[in-house]
């Protein structure tokens, strides 16, 4: 194996190679893949030094900060520094200090450029840090994170304002955090392993993403990420039966429902549709929750959604000074006008209150091609002015139909991300991630909504590679530097000619299959009819949009499920005896194996961790389709999504099987992040442990306990774990792929549970027949409109665990003695549910000359977890929880070490150098020899520590 190290000095590019000492690498590394794909969304991936001489770029898959000298006018490689896992944002504080947020590591790397560039400090922050800015007098560092993560409640920062319990089960909690540090002294208190924030600020929206600073540096703007759009689901139990739209009914609690589901009551072939809930949207004009027919559903909604999206903070006092609502559904980036301070927010606005995919022939309407409008919202003088970037699109004309304008896509921009504004305040540049282009707008026309995309598109800048994610404007050189994620490169654009004049490709450890398949998730130019829609319109960076959609297709036909059904042998007898407990036929037809093309609302599921989860969709209906039928084949199920490119995304044709396989090769490789609620040592709290004991115990929580019936019909009673199977060796994290009948109008597939923690924030649900818990009553403002169950209508896990099928009984259900205590314990356990990766994955610490006492125990923890056995099918089976990597400056470069958990020492590649644990730690006693540790994914340690010949990823300067 060889390692290539590139050094730029005085404009001269030098290369050299060194041999890898194989035997030491093999003994120290865990089994597992050399690379794990996470698909983290870049936020601020490129930055320029204050003096304008150095360009910085994050190498997200490589875990590096890359630096380029701009002295010659073209970026020339200067050095690279290993940071954490999945770096997504970079900011230069001075010419000699750069900060990097590492999304998967829950950390911020402070990189010194003095002497040998290296990490001098690692700040430990909340879950998934995304953006970073500097503002205020004295200067402060502001970092966005989710309102969770192990460090948030670490005893070392217990005295920090805002730190502590994230209150995951408490209503009305702000869930967007900003960690504030003194960058000149990030350790304002002694005894912390990862810095001491001045405060943790929280804002009333869900997990944040972007930050921006006013021109005077005194105001910081904070934006939520997936902030919603004032939509929520009315549960099926609150909707009148029978699809009667004008006939109200009285509900069990004595309140009135305005009628039934808007229908149609059948598909185009006359097959009766299953009863389902419906999506309602708050009408700010008349202050009512309304459906598509304008009917009022206030009696069936128990929360309010203020939809505050962006917040202004005094950078000096850290007090919130303003908030802005209805900015967008998914907010990506922000920028301020350097002349007048106008704030610009790139975003998409979802139309999930419109039902159905397909041509819309039978129902008369469709959401095809009109999923989420690409926008920039202009905020000025307290007013929020959304501007649709693609207002030229006629959404009523579907691709392939008469009158459709096939040229419209050439004027469209998809998934707008980073923005930069000229120093005179007149021109805005926006990175269009799904369009391989940079949009260019006159700011006056943008504010006045007078721009015409058909003519303005002549000024758009095409960029090779695709996945345009970040921008740096270099007016002194007349250049724009553009990060393109698809090919992991930086492009140079001549602003005068609007032509690409140079490109620098960053080393990429991703498998070629990942690189080749990624565009199919995002590329709206190739894979949609109008150039705006893509799979990522809903699956944001391959994850969720935190919304529900009703994507049935009345123009499709009923199909048959091949998936085994828990209680499946019992269901026909219940149907025959009219004992299902339902007020309407199961699945619409009273056939447990029917997939009706109409299904009602379902929340967007993550595309991460699909590989071992069986058939896809909430019902598992992609188990059968275009390319075949299989109950458990995840790959085939993914291929069967091909028609959605036509019926939903809105392309004129669907991809070929070969194209879908390319897509599958990428998407099925993506794994979820480690659980941010579970303890870093993979232990459980007493409550979580009690919940696990019941979950994995023998007591049936659901079904009928009757030996005679079971002998005739097979298993009729199931424990939690027998439905939501946890078997890491098989890749099962809450599902083994079966369906289940649970006393609701449709048979659904049992879902995985790895990301339950990411769905909290909705509190407030009325009484419904399926749930034994009482009406929550009005809970007031909340940050999310969708929670649990397939349709998102159940606010909390605790309420779901009060479902009538889990009712306490003598032989099944929750224990009759203190059932709510056990339900609370199970809720806590599910929020900390096992995942493909151990909680320690990505965690870091930097040992310095002053923090050995505080940071030493964390180093020991990392070493212990690197020796701890772990099982994960996604990682190849039996592995250790992590590979522990360490970096330290030695001589004129940075040396990487890999921990050998058997010998207890650290191995360096060059010359088979070995250092004892104590010897490596002792190096940090010398300023400038700080030692940074990283818990890498099992199997990736040699690549990260020593480099990768396959991709020429070096580790040294």
Model-derived features with residue positions:
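Asp-box/WD-like beta-propeller blade repeats and closely related beta-sheet repeat scaffolds
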Residues: 116-136, 144-150, 155-177, 190-213, ...
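Periplasmic c-type cytochrome electron-transfer domains
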Residues: 118, 215, 221-228, 232, ...
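Short coil/turn segments at the loop-to-beta-strand junctions that recur within blades
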Residues: 82-87, 125-130, 202-209, 326-332, ...
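Beta-propeller domains
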Residues: 57-75, 79, 310
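Beta-strand-rich domains and repeat architectures in extracellular enzymes and scaffolds
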Residues: 33-66, 285, 289-292, 299-300, ...
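Short, conserved, GDST-rich strand-edge loop motifs in beta-rich repeat architectures
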Residues: 144-172, 225-304, 345-373
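Blade-loop segments of beta-propeller domains
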Residues: 74-95, 103, 129
């Amino acid at each position: 194996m060889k390692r290539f190290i590139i050094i730029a000095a005085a404009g001269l590019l030098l290369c050299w190679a060194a041999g890898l000492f194989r035997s030491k690498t093999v003994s120290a590394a865990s089994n597992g893949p050399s690379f794990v794909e996470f698909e983290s969304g870049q936020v601020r991936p490129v930055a320029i030094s204050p003096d304008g001489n150095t360009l910085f770029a994050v190498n997200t898959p490589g875990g590096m900060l890359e630096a380029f000298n701009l002295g010659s006018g073209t970026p020339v490689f200067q050095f690279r520094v290993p940071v954490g896992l999945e770096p997504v944002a970079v900011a230069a504080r001075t010419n000699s200090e750069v900060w990097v947020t590492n999304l998967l590591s829950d950390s911020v790397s402070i990189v010194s450029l003095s002497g040998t560039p290296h990490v001098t400090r690692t700040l430990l922050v909340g879950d998934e840090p995304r953006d970073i800015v500097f503002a205020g007098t004295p200067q402060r560092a502001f970092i966005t994170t989710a309102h969770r993560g192990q460090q948030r409640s670490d005893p070392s920062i217990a005295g920090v304002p805002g730190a502590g319990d994230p209150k995951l089960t408490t209503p009305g909690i702000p869930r967007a955090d900003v960690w504030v540090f003194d960058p000149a002294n990030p350790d304002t208190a002694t005894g912390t392993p990862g810095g001491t924030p001045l405060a943790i600020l929280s804002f009333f929206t869900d997990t944040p993403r972007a930050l921006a600073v006013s021109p005077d540096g005194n105001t910081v703007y904070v934006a939520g990420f997936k902030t919603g759009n004032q939509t929520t689901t009315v549960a099926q139990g609150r909707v009148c039966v029978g699809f009667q739209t004008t006939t109200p009914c009285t509900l069990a609690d004595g309140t009135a429902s305005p009628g039934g589901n808007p229908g149609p009551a059948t598909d185009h072939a006359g097959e009766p549709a299953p009863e389902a809930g419906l999506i309602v949207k708050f009408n700010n004009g008349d202050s009512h929750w309304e459906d598509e027919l304008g009917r009022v559903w206030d009696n069936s909604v128990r929360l309010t959604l203020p939809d505050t999206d962006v917040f202004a903070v005094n950078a000096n006092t850290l007090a919130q000074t303003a908030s802005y609502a209805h900015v967008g559904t998914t907010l990506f980036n922000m920028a301020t006008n350097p002349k007048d301070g106008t704030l610009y927010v790139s975003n998409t606005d979802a139309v999930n209150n419109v039902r159905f995919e397909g041509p819309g022939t039978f129902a008369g309407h469709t959401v095809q091609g009109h999923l989420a409008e690409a926008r920039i919202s202009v905020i000025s003088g307290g007013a929020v002015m959304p501007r649709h970037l693609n207002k030229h699109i006629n959404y009523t004309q579907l691709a392939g139909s008469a009158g459709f304008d096939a040229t419209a896509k050439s004027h469209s921009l998809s998934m707008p991300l980073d923005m930069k504004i000229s120093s005179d305040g007149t021109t805005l540049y926006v990175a269009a991630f799904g369009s391989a282009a940079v949009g260019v707008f006159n700011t006056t026309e943008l504010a006045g909504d007078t721009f015409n995309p058909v003519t303005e598109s002549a000024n758009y800048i095409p960029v090779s590679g695709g996945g345009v994610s970040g921008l740096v404007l270099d007016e002194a050189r007349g250049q724009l530097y553009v990060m393109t994620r698809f090919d992991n490169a930086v492009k140079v654009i001549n602003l005068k000619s609007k032509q690409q004049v140079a490109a620098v490709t960053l080393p990429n450890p991703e498998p070629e299959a990942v690189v080749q398949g990624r565009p199919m998730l995002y590329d709206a130019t190739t894979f949609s009819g109008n150039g705006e829609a893509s799979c990522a319109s809903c699956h944001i960076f391959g994850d969720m949009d935190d919304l529900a959609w009703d994507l049935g297709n009345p123009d499709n036909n009923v199909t048959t499920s091949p998936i085994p059904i828990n209680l499946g042998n019992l269901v026909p007898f219940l149907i025959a005896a009219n004992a299902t407990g339902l007020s309407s036929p199961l699945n619409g037809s009273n056939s447990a194996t029917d997939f009706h093309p109409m299904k009602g609302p379902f929340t967007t599921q993550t595309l991460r961790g699909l590989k071992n989860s069986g058939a896809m969709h909430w019902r598992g209906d992609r188990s059968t389709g275009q390319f075949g039928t299989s109950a458990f084949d995840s790959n085939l199920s993914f291929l069967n999504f091909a028609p959605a490119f036509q019926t939903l995304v809105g392309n004129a044709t669907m991809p070929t099987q070969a194209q879908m396989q390319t897509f599958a090769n990428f998407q099925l490789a993506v794994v979820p992040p480690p659980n941010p609620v579970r303890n870093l040592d993979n232990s459980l709290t007493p409550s979580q442990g009690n919940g696990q004991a019941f979950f994995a115990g023998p007591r049936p929580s659901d079904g009928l306990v009757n030996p005679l019936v079971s002998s005739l019909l097979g298993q009729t009673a199931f424990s939690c774990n027998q439905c939501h199977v946890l078997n890491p060796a098989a890749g099962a994290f809450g599902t083994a792929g079966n369906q289940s009948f649970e006393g609701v109008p449709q048979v659904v597939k049992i879902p995985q549970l790895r990301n339950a923690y990411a769905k909290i924030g909705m509190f407030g649900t009325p009484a419904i027949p399926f749930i034994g818990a009482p009406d929550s009553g009005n809970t007031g403002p909340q940050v999310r409109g969708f929670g649990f169950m397939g349709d998102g209508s159940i606010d909390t896990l605790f309420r779901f665990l009060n479902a009538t099928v889990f009712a306490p009984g003598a032989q099944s259900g929750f224990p009759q003695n203190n059932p709510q205590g056990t339900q609370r314990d199970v809720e806590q356990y599910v929020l900390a549910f096992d995942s493909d990766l151990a909680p320690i994955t990505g965690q870091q610490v930097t040992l310095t000359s002053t923090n050995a006492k505080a940071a030493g125990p964390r180093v020991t923890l990392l070493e212990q977890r690197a020796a701890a056995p772990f099982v994960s099918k996604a990682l190849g089976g039996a592995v250790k929880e992590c590979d522990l990597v360490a970096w330290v400056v030695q001589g004129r470069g940075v040396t990487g070490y890999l921990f050998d958990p058997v010998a207890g020492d650290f191995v360096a590649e060059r010359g088979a150098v070995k250092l004892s644990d104590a010897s490596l730690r002792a190096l940090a006693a010398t300023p400038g020899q700080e030692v940074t540790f990283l818990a890498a994914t099992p199997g990736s340690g040699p690549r990260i520590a020593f480099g990768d010949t396959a991709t020429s990823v070096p580790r040294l300067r």
